[in-house]
From Swiss-Prot:
This is Methylenetetrahydrofolate--tRNA-(uracil-5-)-methyltransferase TrmFO. Its EC number is 2.1.1.74. The keyword Translocase does not apply. It is an enzyme of class 2 (transferase). InterPro entries: FAD/NAD-bd_sf, MnmG-rel, MnmG-rel_CS, MnmG_N, TrmFO. SUPFAM superfamilies: FAD/NAD(P)-binding domain. The lineage of its organism: Bacteria, Pseudomonadati, Pseudomonadota, Alphaproteobacteria, Hyphomicrobiales. Its cofactor is FAD. FAD binds at G13, G14, G15, L16, A17, G18.
Amino acid sequence: MLKTFDTPIHIIGGGLAGCEASWQIAQSGIPVILHEMRPQKKSDAHKTDKLAELVCSNSFRCDDSSTNAVGLLHAEMRLAKSLIMKAADANKVPAGSALAVDRDGFSKTVTSALENHSLITIKREEVQEISKDWKHVIVATGPLTSPAFAQELKAITGIKALSFFDAIAPIIHTDSIDMNICWYQSRYDKIGPEGTGKDYLNCPLNKEQYETFVEALKNAEKTEFRDFEKTPYFDGCLPIEIMAERGLETLRHGPMKPMGLTNAYNPTVKPYAVVQLRQDNKLGTLYNMVGFQTKLKYGEQVRIFRMIPGLEKAEFARLGGLHRNTYLNSPIILDQTLRLKQKKQLRFAGQITGCEGYVESAAIGLLAGRFAAAEYHHNCPCLPPQTTAFGALLNHITGGHIIDEEAERPSFQPMNINFGLFPPISPIRYSGKRLPSKEKKLAKKQAITARALNDCIQWLADKESKSSCLSKNT
């Protein structure tokens, strides 16, 4: 029987991350006080007072753990005895290969489990500031953090650490870019911090290609803002389709300007316009489209962005978007166990850390809960291997993203789990004839997921191992 303790861990926010963190902590014998502002104070998106309410879709996306990154994350969470996954499995509805749930049944299951846990106290109140008497705190307030608490977070983290508008550009798998068309070069061959003068991939367009591209953007189907997202555009974060509507030459003097770039494959012909791709993770497996934040519908993004020379066969790890959000510049202000570097009794979990999606949010809540419980028990939190979905996602949030500390706005952007976040797999050797491209990609995914599940099982079984632990002074 687990020993119980007197001092509680306070968790602010009863969404997926806060609920999962509460469960993981309580299951380790530690009392939890879960603070949820609803129904005392409503948000613009929630409709009920239930915990873990699914505000948008009822889908947890693909449940295939052998060939899909989010399905792999499902499997790892089940191995870690996730409450969120248990509730999802108990409330499944038909959805093909996806895991979709009865949203009301799901929320009721989570709420009931937490209300009936002897070590969890739920306080229905808005937290406007973090009490100095609270020794252990996890903040999991999500993208719709209340204005009052957002001000508290600004004061704690620093104004540059918090963003309130998601400017998301598409991200592309590097191995799907045509390197016979695109070339590496920084504008004017400028060498920045840790740069080489060849830090961008460049996609050239001639005049006809550029004008066709602009026309396609202007005529594309666009997603409208939801009522609670309505915020004026600001010039530093204009959707690319809005720029296209401002005039034929606007993009060519903005994110698609060709100045300072020479086509390595055709140096005597100056590109009329250039789309630049910037490395998005330290592994170099992902590149983002610079300045291409957008509200185009997903299908339109794929169709139109594949018109760009070199991206005809582009595979997208994430498509673009622009919507209201509240998230931290996590790689700068959080340590590897999700603690605030300058105030280590405070952890963050869920979407506010810079992950996207129901499952990702719950997974980071699970990790934050386990890290907090280990620390509470005076044990060293053990990091999941980066080869696991847990570790890949955590690494993106706390260190895998390339940081531009001189940028006016944080360069860090929220991310779903995807195979581009994982370390490359060792080359797969096949006996006999060469595999077709599709079969080779499938085999690669299967190898990554098999490695991940094996490493996750080992991590869960050996989580107190010194070899996978951080120093207590980290």
